[in-house]
């Protein structure tokens, strides 16, 4: 489970382009929270603080305790708008956490891909899925899904049915899919390559 980030925000009562510009001039970022059947809440965040946390790994799957006017809400980042030149955060969408489970997208970390057996024998480790969508218990939301692929041989594919997910998590789909393949040497078409092509065609 990822650590819970504590953030403070202020309610926002003025809207529109002019109000957003005024907030940014004051060093704050407009944001909104919605979802879970609740009334959307418009807020603002301290620009330097939210930009600092955004630049850390896996922010988009970070569980946050957001304090607004002395009330705490459990939320997840949904979308982040950046300045096109400076990469400073300009707007954030958050979603309220569901009471029991939450659908979310998390990054996949392939540990040992440079040392995989198939790579050592001349194969190429090809990533088909960099992120996966999970259904998670709100008390066990992972920052990522980490998979050890050091023993993955040449001409094989890594399928969802073989992945051990963090406790309280499951894939949103029961249909098996390919996450990665080790492609053989050029000119030797493999079963894994065929599965990779089928997976890409089904995207």
UniProtKB/Swiss-Prot annotation:
GO biological process, one term: translation
Highest taxon above the source species: Bacteria
InterPro entries in UniProt: Rbsml_bL25/Gln-tRNA_synth_N, Ribosomal_bL25/Gln-tRNA_synth, Ribosomal_bL25_b-dom, Ribosomal_bL25_C, Ribosomal_bL25_long, Ribosomal_bL25_short, Ribosomal_L25_dom, Ribosomal_uL5_bac-type
GO MF annotations in UniProt: 5S rRNA binding; structural constituent of ribosome
Keywords from the named record: Ribonucleoprotein, Ribosomal protein, RNA-binding, rRNA-binding
Cellular component terms per the entry's GO annotation: cytosolic large ribosomal subunit
Subunit structure: Part of the 50S ribosomal subunit; part of the 5S rRNA/L5/L18/L25 subcomplex. Contacts the 5S rRNA. Binds to the 5S rRNA independently of L5 and L18.
Entry similarity comment: Belongs to the bacterial ribosomal protein bL25 family. CTC subfamily.
Protein name: Large ribosomal subunit protein bL25
Organism expressing this protein natively: Rickettsia conorii (strain ATCC VR-613 / Malish 7)
């Amino acid at each position: 489970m990822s650590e819970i980030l504590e953030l403070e925000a202020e309610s926002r009562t003025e809207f529109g382009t002019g109000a957003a510009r005024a907030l940014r001039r004051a060093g704050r970022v407009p944001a909104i929270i919605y979802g879970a059947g609740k009334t959307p809440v418009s807020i603002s965040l301290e620009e330097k603080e939210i930009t600092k946390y955004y630049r850390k790994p896996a922010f988009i799957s970070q569980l946050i305790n957001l304090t607004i006017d002395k009330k705490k809400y459990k939320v997840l980042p949904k979308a982040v708008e950046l300045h096109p030149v400076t990469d400073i955060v300009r707007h954030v969408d958050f979603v309220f956490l569901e009471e029991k489970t939450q659908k979310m997208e998390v990054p996949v970390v392939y540990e040992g891909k440079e040392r995989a057996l198939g790579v050592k024998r001349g194969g190429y480790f090809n990533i088909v899925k960099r992120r996966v969508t999970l259904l998670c218990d709100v008390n066990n939301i992972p920052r990522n899904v980490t998979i050890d692929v050091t023993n993955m041989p040449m001409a094989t594919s890594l399928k969802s049915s073989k992945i051990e997910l963090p406790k309280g998590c499951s894939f949103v789909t029961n249909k098996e899919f390919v996450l990665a393949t080790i492609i053989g040497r050029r000119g030797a078409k493999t079963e894994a390559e065929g599965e990779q092509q089928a997976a890409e065609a089904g995207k």
